[in-house]
């Protein structure tokens, strides 16, 4: 069985708004359930760090970016749909493919 990949993610939020807090809570729940111990999440408040948002060309919040493993993927807006988040970031496909190959 191959070692699991490490996932590097960035979540861009705009302050402590209910929408930002909900996105963070939902994302942490997904990550702790599906990727415990194999992820790093950096939360960036674009109101406090506008230069980071500008450098990464973030135009709306919340935005979730998967940096590693490549390719970079982004989801903009509502993160409450677990399956949409996993598919949008190519995480669900990776995990299903790994399980299919390791079970045979």
Swiss-Prot record:
Pfam family, one: KaiB
InterPro entries: Circ_KaiB, KaiB-like, KaiB_domain, Thioredoxin-like_sf
Keyword set, alphabetical order: Biological rhythms
SMART domains documented for this protein: KaiB (SM01248)
Record text on subunit structure and interactions: The KaiABC complex composition changes during the circadian cycle to control KaiC phosphorylation. Complexes KaiC(6), KaiA(2-4):KaiC(6), KaiB(6):KaiC(6) and KaiC(6):KaiB(6):KaiA(12) are among the most important forms, many form cooperatively. Undergoes a major conformational rearrangment; in the free state forms homotetramers as a dimer of dimers. When bound to the CI domain of KaiC switches to a monomeric thioredoxin-fold (KaiB(fs)). KaiB(fs) binds CikA, leading it to dephosphorylate phospho-RpaA.
Record function comment: Key component of the KaiABC oscillator complex, which constitutes the main circadian regulator in cyanobacteria. Complex composition changes during the circadian cycle to control KaiC phosphorylation. KaiA stimulates KaiC autophosphorylation, while KaiB sequesters KaiA, leading to KaiC autodephosphorylation. Phospho-Ser-431 KaiC accumulation triggers binding of KaiB to form the KaiB(6):KaiC(6) complex, leading to changes in output regulators CikA and SasA. KaiB switches to a thioredoxin-like fold (KaiB(fs)) when bound to KaiC. A metamorphic protein which reversibly switches between an inactive tetrameric fold and a rare, thioredoxin-like monomeric fold (KaiB(fs)). KaiB(fs) binds phospho-KaiC, KaiA and CikA. KaiA and CikA compete for binding to KaiB(fs), and KaiB(fs) and SasA compete for binding to KaiC, thus the clock oscillator and output signal pathway are tightly coupled.
The protein, known as: Circadian clock oscillator protein KaiB
Origin species: Parasynechococcus marenigrum (strain WH8102)
Gene from which the chain derives: kaiB
């Amino acid at each position: 069985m191959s070692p699991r990949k490490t996932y590097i993610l960035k979540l861009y939020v705009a302050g402590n708004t209910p929408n930002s807090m909900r996105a963070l809570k939902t994302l942490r729940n997904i990550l702790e359930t599906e990727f415990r111990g194999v992820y790093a999440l950096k939360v960036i408040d674009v109101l406090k760090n506008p230069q980071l948002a500008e450098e990464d060309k973030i135009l709306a919040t919340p935005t979730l970016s998967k940096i590693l493993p490549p390719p970079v993927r982004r989801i903009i807006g509502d993160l409450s749909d677990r399956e949409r988040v996993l598919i949008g970031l190519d995480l669900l496909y990776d995990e299903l493919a790994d399980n299919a190959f390791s079970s045979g």
